[in-house]
């Protein structure tokens, strides 16, 4: 990949289920801003957002976060 960014809130939520609606909205707005800037800077055609919830889904860090992978 050309780049990888991590987005996480300062306030604790173990996963998306514990995330407040307000924080979820803020996270997606910031993810869009980051994706727009990184896509332009890295000259990518697209990217992936990864967000795992629960051990069975591969979550190993139990603080909500999203990976933006370019």
Regions picked out by a protein language model, each given a short descriptive name:
Residues 1-70:
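HIT superfamily nucleotide-processing domains
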């Amino acid at each position: 990949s050309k780049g990888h960014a991590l987005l996480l809130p300062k306030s604790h939520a173990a996963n998306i289920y514990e995330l407040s609606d307000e924080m979820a909205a803020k996270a997606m707005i910031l993810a869009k801003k980051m994706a727009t800037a990184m896509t332009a800077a890295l000259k990518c055609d697209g990217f992936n957002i990864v967000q795992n919830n629960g051990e069975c889904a591969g979550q190993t860090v139990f603080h909500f976060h999203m990976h933006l992978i370019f």
